[in-house]
Amino acid sequence: MRRIWLLALAGALAVTLSSWGKKKKEEETQVLQLPKDPPSAITAETRRLVFHVTPLSAKGLLSQQTRDALKWLLHSTNGATVVKLRAFVSGSGDLRRVRELVSETFTEHKLPLPVLSVVQVGALPLELAQVVMESTAVAKKPVNDYGLVYISGQGAYAAEPLDPVLPLATQSLARLATAVKAAGSEPGDVARVTCFLSSLDQFAAVRRMVESNYAGAALNFVQVQRAPTHAVAECEAVARLRWNTGTAVHMLNPEGLEPSPQFSQIVLIGAPKVILTGSQEAFGFQDADARLAFERLQKSLAQEGGSLHEVAFASSYPLSTRISEQVRKIRGEFYDRAHPPAGTMLPFQGLPSMDAGFAVDVVAVKE
């Protein structure tokens, strides 16, 4: 009897040890999958590009709001494939978390990752809102028969940072209307308008003014810095092209809009394909650091068969006026000086890297 009991005990112990060893082995072999990095550049069909802006939410903190924005986006694009996201983040949340959540969400849905730009702003138009996203997606069918129009930010400024923003927005939108008309497009062709403001105190009035002119467009409004050095309203836009330009890209500087040797006011893109990039950050504050950022951007474009000489529109996100001047100086070494791209540049609050002085993303023509 004692022998039988010992054999039973030994068997039970062996089973227990085997089970524990197997469980331990399984635990040891589990590997935490790191989020995939978004691509640095993507090629997309110009005639199928559509644009969305996520609604603001005050529910939860940055992570929840980012998840909710992505959920809304994936349910509101009508089957279009998201190829680019630009996220504006307000508050003290970690901007790097946005990148992680974008990667997780698209991977969970078995969708290709879009290129991504993340920029910190001073404030958003809803209290407690921490993120808003702009989406560029490829629709199932063509929606832009002749291509797209990208309009540079039309800036209006006042010296004092607390000056009211509504008169400045009125000036900016008047110039935007001039640009839309000069491109041969109508207000109903405008697909997205983004207004960068020094203050949101008069946001409701500014929004009503934009909505009255561009009712069918996706609209976005952000306060660029918490404590700007001067008052500003600068609205940029993307619109559908209404006529065949006969060229892949055509720069315009129409009468009524101040010309600049640094950038074009309007770019008409008739090319079948464009290359969209995520933001490339300059790590450091010296000219050499700025050049390295543009060199990395060039490599990203080259992987898709593009070049910085073929950039049609550039969005730059410097963190100070001094850095803005640096970007103006250095970018001329890389862009086509005879035909500089359209674009928007004004100081923002922050970037994902603490060491970054500025970031830049572009739309380039793929000929």
Regions found by a protein language model. Name each.
Residues 1-21:
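N-terminal export/membrane-targeting signals
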Residues 20-313, 318-367:
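N-terminal presequence-like segments and the immediate start of the first folded domain
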